[in-house]
Amino acid sequence: SLDTIKIFTFGILSDCLVFTVLSGFLWLYLIFISNSKYLKPTGYIVFGLLVSLFLYVTFGNTILNEYGGALPEIGMAFIGLKTLLFGLLLFLPKYRSTIRFWLFSFVIFLFVTLILQNGISEFFFWNEFGVKYNFIAVDYLVYTNEVLGNIMQSYPVIPLFSGLFIVAAMVTYFIVKRSKHFIEMIPTFTEKIKISGIYLLLFGLSLLSIP
């Protein structure tokens, strides 16, 4: 019906705005790609700070622990992975270009997967509740075990995710093939400022436009 078309059109527009905002993580990753941060002594200082942060998140009582759920584990895994990858890039300069290429490919794959997964989730969420994402979807992060159990029982998870990963891999291959020059010839500081200006403008407009 016309109402359904309007709802999904509005939903797609809303998703585009949200993804523009969430692309901030991708933007941060891309603008911080450089070789200068691995020079002495900067590289060792940064690595030491990352190790300290990882130990604090792992053994300390952080704000993530107050929220509970899967957030502490997610934070620990993210910082631990960041520390490991920075260490590899720092201590293995001969393999830095190769590691950076595969890391870039993985980040693009992860981003594409999240976008596609969100589309699939919205489809099933609509069929289940008759509405778009709301606070119930946010609660999924807190009640992870219960939600995962319900999903595994209710939907053909393995075929869905198999197809999702195949499509995401194909899209990632196309994107990386067209954009790998970004990591082969790292943009200058001035170029990064220009790119950042454009993104921050889109970020601000999207943030103000999100319903």
Where are these regions (language model features)?
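Transmembrane and membrane-interface helices of multi-pass
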Residues: S1-P211
